[in-house]
Structure formats: C-alpha cells, structure tokens
Amino acid sequence: MSTPQETEASPRTVWVADPMHTQVEFAAKHLGMMTVRGHFADVTITGTIDPFQHDATSLEVTIQTASIRTNNEQRDNDLRASNFLEVDTYSTITFKSSTVEHVGGDRYTLSGDLTIKGTTHPVTLHVVRYGEFNDPRMGHRISYGAEATINRKDFGMTFNALLDGRWVVSDEVQILIEGELVERPQA
C-alpha cells in the first residue's frame, strides 16, 4: 500500500507481519459507560504488496481465537465460550482483502471479507501507512495502522443482558491493528 515513489520494494513483494511488532486489539462498551479493551496474542498476516498496481495487492490476516486477552481471566473465558467466539468450534478469525484504494497521502482503504464463527461479511479497514524503513538487523519494513468497526451480532455473537436498564455489551466493536510488515526473502 505504497506509492511507486515511496517504496524500494520490487513489485508484488511478499510481506509477513513481525509478531513482535504487530498487535490486533478490540474495544467494546461495557454497560454503556466503560470501554473494555483486549487483544489477540496469536496473529499471522501475510500478503503481496504491489506499489505500482494496488489491485494486485492482497493481504490475509489469521487470528487464533483462543489467544484473546482482556486482563480478566473470567471475561476471557466468557469470550472464548459459546456466547461469543466459541473457540472450540471456531479456532480462527480471518480477513482476506479484495481491494485496496488510495484515499490520499498515506491513507488507504482495504476492503475484504471478515469471517468470525463461520459467518463472513464484507469489511473495510481504514489504513494509515506510518512509514517504511530498512533495518540492517531486522530487514525491510512497512509500518501501518488500520481500524474498522463491526457489529458483533452480524457474526453470531448475539448474547446480551440488561442490567439496570443498560446493555452489558455494546453491539459495536472497534478493531485496531498496528504493526510492521517485513519483506520476505524470495526463494
């Protein structure tokens, strides 16, 4: 997701996420008052980026659902259970891109299919390219951030309860991805 002047990568270069510098986070309202945040500890991102032809760019994200963390073991177990992610049946969340659009400057939209609990819906990620650099130790890298908002009920996570007139969990969930993609050496 770079312009030809911005990248030194050869066309259709394969990239992978650096797991030490990549995070997928989420946020949802609890009782309409507080934002609960969490992340997934096991995420893989791979793809091909062609700086000359955005339509040749494709990315795939795979998240291991059991790796969900919110700093609360009871809540994590609830999120892994059947009311939410149902990790024993659905071990992964996937996103497969279909189109990239350059919005302007360092901003892009990355549209594709998000699959959670066996249900797939189109989602558009709003992407900001933070920069690109060559690190002699760690390789050629592109740094980015992306975000989207989804309705969890669209993906079969319909549990909710009213407490004192307030819903326990918001329907809207914000997804935030930040990280570094590393150019994979070509064989």
Question: Which residues make up each language-model segment?
Answer:
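Low-complexity, acidic/polar, glycine-enriched regions of mature
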Residues: 1-187
